[in-house]
């Protein structure tokens, strides 16, 4: 994805009137400034994305103003306003709230500054020149297929068996989250319908399972509430989590409820392949 993003930035540079040939570095006396704003430094993936983007752009001859907004929408607005005022030639925005930047995006458009929406689509605006992302629905489908195969849901259905499941989906202000949910449910909904999968909390809609700002703490609290309210006499078999941070929250809740690896530990999914998540997988979580 990193190379695709750099290519998109190079294309946007041409839109802004820069004479740039992809793969050819910008002359030292003609450097252009790219403003990059990421949602937060609290998550490994955003740190990596920001630093990798900065490295690739600087290697291509650009100057880069990289900032992190600490999951504060107003801070991100201020960062973008300052970047516009400083005369950036292009903006790369990984938004906190996909619909909260309309006014500042209009400022950039009026200033002739192209915008690249990175990972998360910017909504309710025509100021976006490019959108660099991945197949979010495909990620959800992959998670669903992993659950289907790991638990052999078709065999369970044929045998009249069932598994319990609870859902931990992404932020409602992130357009990607709904795509992922739809991909996941495209695989799992038939098994919910025929009783092979049982969600004892009854919370299966996106509205009921989405977690604002991808909060690990909220995921942990939700999981604790599910375990206390619905699983006192039965074990939870699957935590369908859309994000590694949610998986950490579920892990903490499950450990607090006495679940043990190798005994009754449920299947937990995630996304981003953070180092801690990979270590958890190796350890059997």
Where are these regions (language model features)?
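A residue-level marker of the well-folded mature domains of exported/periplasmic proteins
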Residues: 2-5, 26-285
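Hydrophobic core
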Residues: 9-19
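Cleavable N-terminal signal peptides
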Residues: 15, 25-26
């Amino acid at each position: 994805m990193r190379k695709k993003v750099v290519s998109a930035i190079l294309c946007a540079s041409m839109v802004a009137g820069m004479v740039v040939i992809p793969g050819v570095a910008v002359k030292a006396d003609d450097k252009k400034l790219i403003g990059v704003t990421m949602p937060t430094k609290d998550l490994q993936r955003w740190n990596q994305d920001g630093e990798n983007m900065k490295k690739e752009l600087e290697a291509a001859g650009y100057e880069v103003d990289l900032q992190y907004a600490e999951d504060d929408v107003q801070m991100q607005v201020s960062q973008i306003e300052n970047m516009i005022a400083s005369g950036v030639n292009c903006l790369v925005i990984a938004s906190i709230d996909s619909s909260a930047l309309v006014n500042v995006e209009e400022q950039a458009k009026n200033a002739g500054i192209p915008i690249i929406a990175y990972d998360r689509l910017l909504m309710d605006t025509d100021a976006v020149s490019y959108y660099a992302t991945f197949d979010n629905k495909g990620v959800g489908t992959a998670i669903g297929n992993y659950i289907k195969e790991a638990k052999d849901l078709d065999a369970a259905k044929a045998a009249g068996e069932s598994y319990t499941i609870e859902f931990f989906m992404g932020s409602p202000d992130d357009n990607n989250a709904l795509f992922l949910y739809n991909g996941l449910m495209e695989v799992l909904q038939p098994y919910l319908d025929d009783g092979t999968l049982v969600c004892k909390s009854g919370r299966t809609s996106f509205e009921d399972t989405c977690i604002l700002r991808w909060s690990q703490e909220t995921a942990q609290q939700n999981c604790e509430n599910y375990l206390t309210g619905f699983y006192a006499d039965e074990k939870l078999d699957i935590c369908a989590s859309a994000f590694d941070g949610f998986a950490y929250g579920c892990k903490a809740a499950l450990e607090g409820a006495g679940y043990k690896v190798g005994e009754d530990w449920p299947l937990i999914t995630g996304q981003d392949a953070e180092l801690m998540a990979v270590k958890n997988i190796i350890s059997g979580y």
